[in-house]
Amino acid sequence: MICYFLVVTINFLKEKTTICHYFVNIFSLFLFLFVFVFVFIFVYFFYVILFYRFCSLFTYFPANSIWYYLSIINIFFPLCFFLYENFTGRNRRKCSLFCLTLIKITYTSPNHGFMVTGKEKFEKLRD
């Protein structure tokens, strides 16, 4: 989110657009975040209640730890920003690359649990 504010501000200063255009971008960001929070709570409810047993195979963290919740946000937040940037066409090149980089780090980091199968998790816990 901070990156988005910086990119919008830099584009505002660089392109010398009107102040109205700047606030429209910021307002659209807050509107998007409101929708994102609503959708995230809805998805999170079903994620925990309905798919907890299946999805817990893909994370190292216990379900009651803060890292478990942060790992879920780490996937949804950059992905939603990437979709938002591509659908609206705002700052497409800069923010989309940033968001894709976050998603790539999330999915490929060796210390992160999302690329680990249930069998490997069980073997790691056993050791």
Curated annotation (Swiss-Prot):
State the superkingdom. Eukaryota
Positions of glycan attachment: 86
The keyword Membrane is assigned to this record: yes
Glycoprotein found in the keyword field: yes
A GO cellular component annotated for this chain's UniProt record is:
endoplasmic reticulum
The protein's location, in the record's own words, is: Membrane
Indicate where this protein is primarily found.
membrane
TM region positions = 29-49, 63-83
Ordered alphabetically, the record's keywords are:
Glycoprotein, Membrane, Transmembrane, Transmembrane helix
UniProt membrane topology term: Multi-pass membrane protein
Q: What does this protein do?
A: Required for survival during stationary phase.
Q: What is this protein called?
A: Stationary phase protein 3
| Lineage of the organism | Eukaryota, Fungi, Dikarya, Ascomycota, Saccharomycotina
